[in-house]
């Protein structure tokens, strides 16, 4: 798992070990800001009530065992949020630029294997996002923010020919979903 340490005591960083470069979280904040600005200037979607929704990667079981392949984050989600944990979602409010990270709600028993379970505030600081909630609250949080339109990924990678995984979550059917706008803009 990558470390997110503080660079000179001031800023969190993404790092894959002591002998690798430290990437400041401000890079990912800037990526998010540029994406929001690009969507707002290059498309005709309304800014008010529109949110970009990205789904992070999930763990993949190793055949029929109770272990998983080493986890690798979904590329677009990594580019926006630099999150190392599986099963997360991210949202960006086109009107305000607010970044929201949704983390899985883990049962207390996980601490037996995983060690101390981090709080939402821990994740907010670690990943330099504006707000954090649990993944079982996505629809409720978006409703509270008067979300009308969700921009989701849907497109084919021009190099691999593989299809991007479109975000889905419980309650997504309560919102209008546009899966055409985001992919060409995030790829630029």
Please state what every model-predicted region is.
Residues 1-188:
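A composition/biophysics-driven feature that prefers long, compositionally simple stretches
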């Amino acid at each position: 798992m990558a470390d997110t340490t503080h660079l000179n005591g001031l800023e969190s960083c993404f790092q894959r070990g002591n002998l690798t470069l430290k990437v400041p979280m401000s890079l990912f904040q800037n990526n998010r800001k540029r994406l929001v600005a690009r969507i707002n200037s290059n498309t005709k979607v309304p800014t008010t009530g529109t949110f970009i929704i990205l789904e992070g990667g999930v763990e993949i079981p190793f055949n029929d065992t109770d272990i998983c392949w080493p986890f690798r984050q979904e590329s677009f989600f990594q580019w926006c949020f630099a999150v190392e944990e599986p099963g997360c979602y991210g949202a960006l409010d086109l009107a305000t630029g607010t970044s929201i990270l949704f983390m899985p709600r883990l049962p207390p028993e996980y601490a037996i294997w995983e060690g101390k379970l981090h709080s939402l505030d821990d994740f907010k600081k670690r990943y330099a996002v504006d707000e954090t909630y649990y993944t079982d609250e996505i629809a409720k949080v978006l409703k509270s923010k008067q979300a009308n339109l969700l921009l989701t990924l849907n497109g084919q990678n021009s190099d691999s020919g593989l299809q991007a995984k479109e975000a889905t979550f419980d309650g997504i059917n309560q919102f209008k979903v546009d899966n055409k706008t985001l992919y060409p803009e995030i790829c630029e």
